[in-house]
């Protein structure tokens, strides 16, 4: 029966993958309340054109709230076609809004006012206001029919806005009152407009017309489109057949914006993107149609130019040629690396490869390039990761999805029936054999329960256990499987304290340590890797947490007023990570730890901050993270310097290195044989020196049975003289959002760095950290110029892990970097071995890198 939970686990992981949208913003997921009903939007950000009295002011227009007189009510009755009255909400930052909710004034049964209809106006800058319209041009939305029911309305298409106005509409003179809520999520792209040539018409054989215009563009439209957003940012990716559409009741071709080669005199289409501020760009993803049988292909090359604020376009463009695909007609995302270029505007020229070029989505992975030191710390909450009752599943492509799920379920049921039938007959045979043998002999077992463990295939002695990972099992369908039906005994049950732990990501102890010198791996069943402040959390043995739970934190309390905030590095559901500068840190640090600066000089530190509105579980997890960090004492692991836990917001202060993370550091450098004379280089010796330090830090973590779970160059900080320290907040940074795969809002996974067993079985171990080290080593020797498996989509990466599991020689490995010697690439390949017990330990990796350095 061990296969049944395994197969169900794999199905559980794959179902969200099958149904997940391919666009960066998925309207089916981005449906979180933005703070009217919950109170996160403050009163001063809710304004109105007028109010009937102080008790019906704008601040009382919160959905499902009975404060004041129960709603916002304008001063005078609303007249037909008189659109002067409005309720306005300022979100302070751009948001992707997919749903609105309205309600009238009930006031405990005393109110009878409501708005039967309303319009939505929105603005991204507070000056230019846009009237929302649906895909057929209708602007008026149906409102409430009574004063108490909540009426939810999908915005199709969704909008990107900072300011939103609700404008009540009536067909006769009447008093109206409104309570409202907005649903959506933060608009992380930062894109405020794109300018492009207007889309065109595709005429099919027979005369049918496919309209490929941007029908919901909210800017000016003529021969070109200017100062607006539309279908390229609506979160809906087009189908393989551009004559079909995801959306109901719209015309064929709606999902795509398309251009004909003849309309472009230079052989390319130029699109200019304007952003909210200067940003650091990692990648651009373009969803393209490739129905080459109808003359449609992805672009053959793109050239992108960059501009900061009102300056001229920079002359050195990024050029990215593509390998055309004349075999697979599927639509796909094309990822274009932007090499951390800084800009507030990007102009891209997409070159035709055939008669037509069609796009359905364009997204950017970026982070703000700088932060204003005088800005107040943000207080707006992040979208919760818990299940939202408003969440709706994208019903597009429903029949195909249902067919796939039904087929998978039938296959699983058939396998389960076969296994149960086999076990039934096996028990019958066992009973018969027992009856025959009971008169002849008695079999008794005297193995001590605290020093033996049974695998699925055989009983194991202590010496055997130490060398086997607990997920390296022999499956029943393999010929070498033998079931010891007469000798299987029940495993000892866990005590309640061992079975459950209050710290997310804690490893459950599966066996005692073997003899000294025999390595074993800590093992954890983990789905969500993210901590409360957005970074990954270490997977820690339960026995270690039990020891830490009774200890006080041996770290000094630091005066909060001495922190000077420089930049926000990242954020999570309940907290943020900031880059700060402090003076006088030497008075508070551990006496055994030396700061890498001269005395009395300011020190750069990373501050993890828990927001004051965090719940009790988040606070407990944050304090446990402090206890874990306080135990880490290694020169290649960031050090916990001090804490601020006497009052809110709780903070932990850790080291930060002057050269930032290794990913950005290497992307600013080139190999020593580079032809560029104006770019700094890093020698092969220094690359190996940094890799050796990463191995040393991971060797220390593995000695504690700690599992990092997100080892990558983005989580390695670089100091003076190429010193390296391993950190844990890369996951919180929007700059690296493209490195993570989000499964229906439940988990954020770095799948391009994860081992096959981590993706398919949810197993995170020291062995899976070894796999990630191999990918990190590959990043280092490629100078972080591209993502691992950049030629594969996220779905193809997951498919490739299945090939590693099947081990039939069809798996794809990362290629050998140009400056990487054979010995180092051989080490990488050993980290990616299918069987975990065949991968090297970090002690072996560290020793091997040291020996190579001495050659």
UniProtKB/Swiss-Prot annotation:
N-glycosylated. Tyrosine phosphorylated in response to collagen binding. Phosphorylated by SRC; this is required for activation and subsequent autophosphorylation on additional tyrosine residues. InterPro entries: DDR1-2_DS-like (IPR048525), FA58C (IPR000421), Galactose-bd-like_sf (IPR008979), Kinase-like_dom_sf (IPR011009), Prot_kinase_dom (IPR000719), RTK (IPR050122), Ser-Thr/Tyr_kinase_cat_dom (IPR001245), Tyr_kinase_AS (IPR008266). It is found in: Cell membrane. GO terms for biological process: biomineral tissue development; cell adhesion; cell surface receptor protein tyrosine kinase signaling pathway; cellular response to angiotensin; cellular response to hypoxia; cellular response to transforming growth factor beta stimulus; chondrocyte proliferation; collagen fibril organization. Keywords: ATP-binding, Cell membrane, Disease variant, Disulfide bond, Dwarfism, Glycoprotein, Kinase, Membrane, Nucleotide-binding, Osteogenesis, Phosphoprotein, Receptor, Signal, Transferase, Transmembrane, Transmembrane helix, Tyrosine-protein kinase. GO terms for molecular function: ATP binding; collagen binding; protein tyrosine kinase collagen receptor activity; transmembrane receptor protein tyrosine kinase activity. The modification Phosphotyrosine is found at residues 471, 736, 740-741. It is linked to Spondyloepimetaphyseal dysplasia, short limb-hand type: A bone disease characterized by short-limbed dwarfism, a narrow chest with pectus excavatum, brachydactyly in the hands and feet, a characteristic craniofacial appearance and premature calcifications. The radiological findings are distinctive and comprise short long bones throughout the skeleton with striking epiphyses that are stippled, flattened and fragmented and flared, irregular metaphyses. This is Discoidin domain-containing receptor 2. The lineage of its organism: Eukaryota, Metazoa, Chordata, Craniata, Vertebrata.
